[in-house]
């Protein structure tokens, strides 16, 4: 029995609250059960130097955890004077995932920065960040159209992510912290709304997993992501 009585293929309740803050062009509070992340999308005119003159835009991301988002307090990385390797890995993942959602040529020379700040962590903070940031990005892009900066919205479709893993020999979807910490296999999967894979991060924490188990986990992830995308679209329709 899973901690919340969920079936193995069931994601936690997902909530997406749009326009959560007033200054950013897009802002979303995303909740996967007890994991809560504030995602904002900020638009700037211009692109990084390596893209100047190429007529395309750029999407980048930053990720951080509030000191008491976890069971015990972690010092802010700013106080330590440098970002940790995990932080850099996750923010690059978020940016790669969201670039797959946008036609960067159609975006033109704008840069959109996605800031994902974890308010409370209970497993799956990177997958929640991608899911929430995609909705914040959609709102920001629509603002560019409404303000006459773009003729058409360059969003190609939704992108979402979910964790899957093997715990006590069983494949499960959307791991909470207690499940994640006990997982024999831990995997994060990012997909487009039509089920194409953007990224798979999978690690055998204990026993190596088989090819068949990999396919089972990917199928679980696709089912979970279909449910999450439906929630994203419902949030954007309101």
Curated annotation (Swiss-Prot):
Q: Which Gene3D superfamilies does UniProt cross-reference here?
A: GHMP Kinase, N-terminal domain
Name the CDD domains for this protein.
RNase_PH_bact
InterPro entries linked to this entry: ExoRNase_PH_dom1, ExoRNase_PH_dom2, ExoRNase_PH_dom2_sf, PNPase/RNase_PH_dom_sf, Ribosomal_Su5_D2-typ_SF, RNase_PH, RNase_PH_bac-type, RNase_PH_CS
Tell me the keywords, alphabetical order: Nucleotidyltransferase, RNA-binding, rRNA processing, Transferase, tRNA processing, tRNA-binding
Q: Give the reaction(s) catalysed.
A: tRNA(n+1) + phosphate = tRNA(n) + a ribonucleoside 5'-diphosphate
Q: Give GO MF terms, alphabetically.
A: 3'-5'-RNA exonuclease activity; tRNA binding; tRNA nucleotidyltransferase activity
Which annotated residues bind phosphate? 86, 124-126
Annotated GO biological processes are: rRNA catabolic process; rRNA processing; tRNA processing
Top-level taxon of the source organism: Bacteria
Q: Does the keyword DNA damage apply?
A: no
Q: Kind of enzyme, top EC level?
A: transferase
EC number(s) given by UniProt: 2.7.7.56
The signal peptide here is none
The subunit structure is: Homohexameric ring arranged as a trimer of dimers.
The role this protein plays is: Phosphorolytic 3'-5' exoribonuclease that plays an important role in tRNA 3'-end maturation. Removes nucleotide residues following the 3'-CCA terminus of tRNAs; can also add nucleotides to the ends of RNA molecules by using nucleoside diphosphates as substrates, but this may not be physiologically important. Probably plays a role in initiation of 16S rRNA degradation (leading to ribosome degradation) during starvation.
Which family does the UniProt entry place this protein in?
Belongs to the RNase PH family.
Protein name listed in UniProt: Ribonuclease PH
Which species does this protein come from? Answer: Shigella flexneri
**Taxonomic lineage per UniProt?**
Bacteria, Pseudomonadati, Pseudomonadota, Gammaproteobacteria, Enterobacterales
Gene name in the database record: rph
């Amino acid at each position: 029995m899973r901690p919340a009585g969920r079936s193995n293929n069931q994601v936690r309740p997902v909530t997406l609250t749009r326009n959560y803050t007033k200054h950013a062009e897009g802002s979303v509070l995303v909740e996967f059960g007890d994991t809560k992340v504030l995602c904002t999308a900020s638009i700037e005119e211009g692109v990084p130097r390596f893209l100047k003159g190429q007529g395309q835009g750029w999407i980048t991301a930053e990720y951080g955890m509030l000191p008491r988002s976890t069971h015990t307090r972690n010092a802010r990385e700013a106080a330590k004077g440098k970002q940790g390797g995990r932080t850099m890995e996750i923010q690059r993942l978020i940016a790669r995932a969201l670039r797959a959602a946008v036609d960067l040529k159609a975006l033109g020379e704008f840069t959109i920065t996605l800031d994902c700040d974890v308010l409370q962590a209970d497993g799956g903070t990177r997958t929640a960040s991608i899911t929430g940031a995609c909705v914040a990005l959609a709102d920001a892009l629509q603002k560019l159209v409404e303000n006459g900066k773009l003729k058409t919205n360059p969003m190609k479709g939704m992108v979402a992510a979910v964790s899957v893993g093997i715990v006590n020999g069983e494949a499960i979807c959307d791991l909470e912290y207690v499940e994640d910490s006990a997982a024999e296999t831990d995997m994060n999967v990012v997909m487009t709304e039509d089920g194409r894979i953007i990224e798979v991060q999978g690690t055998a924490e204990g026993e190596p997993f088989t090819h068949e188990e990999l396919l089972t986990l990917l199928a679980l992830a696709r089912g979970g992501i279909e449910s999450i995308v439906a929630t994203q679209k419902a949030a954007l329709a309101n």
